[in-house]
């Protein structure tokens, strides 16, 4: 029987010795099973027992690998997703972080779960990303992608900004607020949730717009069709600097009068899970929801 995966990438920037050991254990275990294994080159100075030719950058890993195993928390997954979504690479996560909504394998027992996945017993789902573009004087000045959210916010803490929101070129509303969170369903359990946004099922083709501390009593989160194009027109009277933050990891500078275009990316993250994965079990477990009554 043909194996579903032949080349496997191990990705992640570890913060502690336990995570480093997980990378090392994964590499030697997968190699012993006959897989061709490559590791994120950010670990080349740490994993000195791995041959130098087995390290590659994220883009090269996306080009080579059938499967990428991301070790760490959701931050590592977000950073990898923006690159790996460009390629036909399936992705699974081993949780070495905190909540771990995206990295769901237990690091103490990853071999048992991964054995079944490597044999083809897994659930696959596609998660869409957002593209964020900063337009100035009719030109795109900068752009990036986000798996969770793109956030317009001031460069200063506790500093309001003014902007208008358009959906498919149709004016929707204006805001005087600390900013706006534009979230995917994947990101609805992240920063958007902290801001009072709704939890969206990950398979839903929708985008949520969540105002951050709006200076009005009537402002509420808004969910729109995922194929809509969001345009934020930043007031030319705003003072100071503003930014668009993609997944809290990449910042795009924004000037007064700029336009911000946010829309669904054509790229998809091919996220896989063990067969017993349940999104609602994850929500219940991570968010501390009540158990069954009977």
Curated annotation (Swiss-Prot):
Taxonomic superkingdom: Bacteria
Reactions catalysed, as given in the entry: NAD(+) + ATP = ADP + NADP(+) + H(+)
Enzyme Commission number: 2.7.1.23
Sample GO molecular function, one term: metal ion binding
Localization per record: Cytoplasm
Required co-factors: a divalent metal cation
Entry annotation: catalytic residues: 74 (proton acceptor)
Main location class: cytoplasm
Keyword ATP-binding: yes
A cellular component term, taken from the record's GO annotations: cytoplasm
Role description: Involved in the regulation of the intracellular balance of NAD and NADP, and is a key enzyme in the biosynthesis of NADP. Catalyzes specifically the phosphorylation on 2'-hydroxyl of the adenosine moiety of NAD to yield NADP.
Family affiliation: Belongs to the NAD kinase family.
Name of the protein in question: NAD kinase
Lineage: Bacteria, Pseudomonadati, Pseudomonadota, Gammaproteobacteria, Vibrionales
């Amino acid at each position: 029987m043909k194996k579903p995966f032949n080349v496997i990438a191990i990705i992640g920037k570890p913060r502690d010795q336990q995570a480093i050991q997980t990378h090392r254990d994964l590499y030697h275990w997968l190699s012993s099973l006959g897989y061709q294994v490559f590791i994120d080159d950010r670990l080349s100075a740490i994993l000195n027992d791995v041959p130098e030719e087995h390290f590659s950058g994220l883009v090269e890993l996306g080009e080579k690998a059938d499967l990428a195993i991301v070790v760490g928390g959701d931050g590592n997954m977000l950073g990898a997703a923006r690159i790996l979504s460009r390629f036909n690479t399936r992705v699974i996560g081993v949780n070495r972080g905190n909540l771990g909504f995206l990295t769901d394998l237990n690091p103490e027992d990853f071999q048992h779960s991964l054995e079944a996945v490597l044999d083809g017993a897994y659930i696959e789902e596609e998660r869409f990303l957002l593209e964020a573009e900063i337009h100035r004087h009719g030109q795109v000045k900068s752009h990036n992608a986000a798996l969770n959210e793109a956030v317009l916010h001031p460069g200063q803490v506790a500093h309001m900004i003014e902007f208008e929101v358009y959906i498919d070129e149709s004016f929707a509303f204006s805001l005087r607020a600390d900013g706006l969170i534009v979230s995917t369903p994947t990101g609805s359990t992240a920063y958007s949730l902290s801001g009072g946004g709704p939890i969206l099922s990950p398979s839903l083709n929708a985008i949520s717009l969540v105002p951050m501390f709006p200076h009005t009593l009537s402002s509420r989160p808004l969910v729109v069709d995922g194929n809509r194009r969001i345009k934020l027109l930043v007031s030319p009277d705003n003072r100071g600097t503003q930014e668009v933050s993609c997944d809290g990891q990449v910042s795009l500078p924004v000037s007064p009068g700029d336009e911000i275009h946010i829309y669904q990316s054509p790229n998809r993250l091919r996220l896989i899970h063990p067969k017993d994965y349940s999104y609602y079990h994850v929500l219940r477990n991570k968010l501390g929801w009540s158990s069954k009554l009977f």
